[in-house]
Amino acid sequence: MQPLPSLCGRALVALILACGVAGIQAEEREFPPAGATQPLPGTGEMMETPTETSWPGRSNASDPRSSATPQIPRGGRMAGIPPRTPPPCDGPIEIKETFKYINTVVSCLVFVLGIIGNSTLLRIIYKNKCMRNGPNILIASLALGDLLHIIIDIPINTYKLLAKDWPFGVEMCKLVPFIQKASVGITVLSLCALSIDRYRAVASWSRIKGIGVPKWTAVEIVLIWVVSVVLAVPEAVGFDIITSDHIGNKLRICLLHPTQKTAFMQFYKTAKDWWLFSFYFCLPLAITALFYTLMTCEMLRKKSGMQIALNDHLKQRREVAKTVFCLVLVFALCWLPLHLSRILKLTLYDQHDPRRCEFLSFLLVLDYIGINMASLNSCINPIALYLVSKRFKNCFKSCLCCWCQSFEEKQSLEEKQSCLKFKANDHGYDNFRSSNKYSSS
């Protein structure tokens, strides 16, 4: 039998390769006609395909199945006035069936691995008292947000890609993007809180505690969920179902409505891509870079004055810091292609450029690779914890392999020893502080 780390590593490589193949398959297709929209599996939203008009059905000029020349607007047009839309892109407009199947397989793998990994992670932290500390509770909050997204969003988005028509009603049309944005918000804010927590743990040695959840961590988790839900409300308000004519068929499409009723929602629709890129991608990277730099400087400054008895405790803190950094790195790698595709379209796309079709084809490939990579982020955190953290690896082995009758009984000897070391280090540090206090007085 192959060792479990090898199997996890191979499964992870297979998932990433599948995401790339899905993007390559998407490259072999061109764009659907104006008015058609494509579902974004794993993002909980619909994206208007890159056509020459933003409102579905407004013009048939970009439909390759229509006449070769653009239609003249009703009432004709005056001489000397150029047409409103450039010539259409040539090529087929069908989505490759192979891409649909590959995307479905990737979504099913994410669904299965995500449910198993995140539910196991929650069970480990809930059952094992040694794992109930501030950073792990934040990781549990992150896993719970991913689990909600996996259970609700991924099946619906997969069905949406295969069926094209939206059959679930207005309520689900608003709920799916709301949960998706709330889940990403929980992930982003949890990673920020973990990075700040690692710096505070190094900078304030009086905060050393063995087992238990600090009150401030509980307040942080409540704030993270409340802020994430509030920031996701515009998605529920703005998304709606519209009816579009597509080759003689009326399709119900769930998307961010092109015409919003309020000035705020119109501004949100206009600035959405930049808002998502800045808050949901750049913020956790900037926070992590800032506080990990401060943490490194603090550890180098205090290195000479640290007591040898605290070495085991410092090793545990370095492992936690390495784990948090790994989670942030995985998040950045998974979400970079999708955000890069959207930003490139906003900054470089010109509908009057004669080479726009090739550029849109490249963006479409990048977009679909990004969609699958973003979905992968919902299931990859437990795998990353297993590969990086020895403590989580032991707990995952005990919980998944079922070596004993119950989780409490099968807790490894190494975990018990780590708990004893944790308490002993705290006691040793208290004695160290007391001796310094009396010696200074």
Curated annotation (Swiss-Prot):
Lipid attachment, kind S-palmitoyl cysteine: 402, 404
Biased composition (Low complexity): 41-53
Positions on the Cytoplasmic side per record topology: 126-136, 197-217, 296-323, 389-441
Extracellular side: 27-100, 163-174, 243-270, 350-361
Feature: compositional bias, Polar residues: 54-70
SMART domains: 7TM_GPCR_Srsx
PTM-bearing positions, type Phosphoserine: 304, 418, 434-435, 439-441
GO biological processes: aldosterone metabolic process; calcium ion transmembrane transport; calcium-mediated signaling; canonical Wnt signaling pathway; chordate pharynx development; developmental pigmentation; endothelin receptor signaling pathway; enteric nervous system development
SUPFAM superfamilies: Family A G protein-coupled receptor-like
A single MF term (Gene Ontology): peptide hormone binding
Post-translational modification: It is not sure whether phosphorylation is on Ser-434 or Ser-435.
Keyword Ribonucleoprotein: no
This protein's name: Endothelin receptor type B
UniProt source species: Bos taurus
